Every structure is written in structure tokens, then in C-alpha cells.
Amino acid sequence: MKHLGTILFAIIFLSIARSNAADLQVKMLDNSKEGTMAFEPGFIKAGVGDTIIFTPGNKGHNSASMLVPTGAKQWKGEFDKEIRVKLEKEGVYLFACDAHKVMGMVGVIQAGKAVNLAEAKKKVEEENAKIFLNKDRFSKALAQVTKP
């Protein structure tokens, strides 16, 4: 009987934990309030367990990870297709559109604490040298990350 109570508690706890996870949408656009070739929003503060849904607002875009926390899964979406990315590890995730990265079509996700912020800052600095349009977009998005 004691074990049954423990099992029931675990089931209820897991159900509550799952119900707290959110689906957050990011649009892939030619033009947005952020300017040309942009993800909207370009910065997302999420929780571990949340799912980011990248949806095409215009043709010719995808979402691909550039940096993920240790142990997290990389992703590479197909062009013109929705992709769902579940945030299973705490930290900073950097992403871009493969076709428009040099135009500053980049973004940042913070899931929980920014445990890999130093690594993310270094990667953004490296990538900024390759961007010729919307040069400050990556740095502005990363500046919204709250320190661990």
C-alpha cells in the first residue's frame, strides 16, 4: 500500500509538470518589426520542457541550431516547413536561417538559467564577423539573456 501511494504521487507530479510546459511560436519572415529577414520574436525566454514552434511566414526560410547547451539536441529544419524543438536542457540556444544567416536572420532562446552564457557570447562574437546586414541583431538578442 505504501508503494501505491508513492506511485500515485509520482504520476500526479509528472502530470502537473507536463501541463506547465508551453508551446511558443517563432515566425520566420522576410519582413518584421525587427527589420528584413528576421525571426519574430528574435529572443525567447522559455522554460525547460517548453517547445519552440518555428513556423514559416514566408518561403525560403528554415531554423537550424548554431549552439545548444551541453547534452541538448541540435536541430536543422527543412526550408518552408514547421519544426518543433523541445528544450530539454537549461541554457542558451542560438539559431539561424541557413539561407539568411549572413543577413542577420538569427535568434536566441534562454531556457531556465543561462548556464552556457560565456560560450554563447563567444559564438555570437564569431558569427557577428560574418553578418553583413542587421549586424547588431544577434548581440541585441543575446543582451536580453538574464545572467545565471
Task: Indicate where each model-derived feature is located.
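Extracytoplasmic copper-binding redox domains, predominantly the cupredoxin/blue-copper superfamily
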Residues: 20-148
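Positively charged n-region of N-terminal signal peptides that target proteins for export
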Residues: 1-5
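Bacterial N-terminal signal peptides
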Residues: 6-15
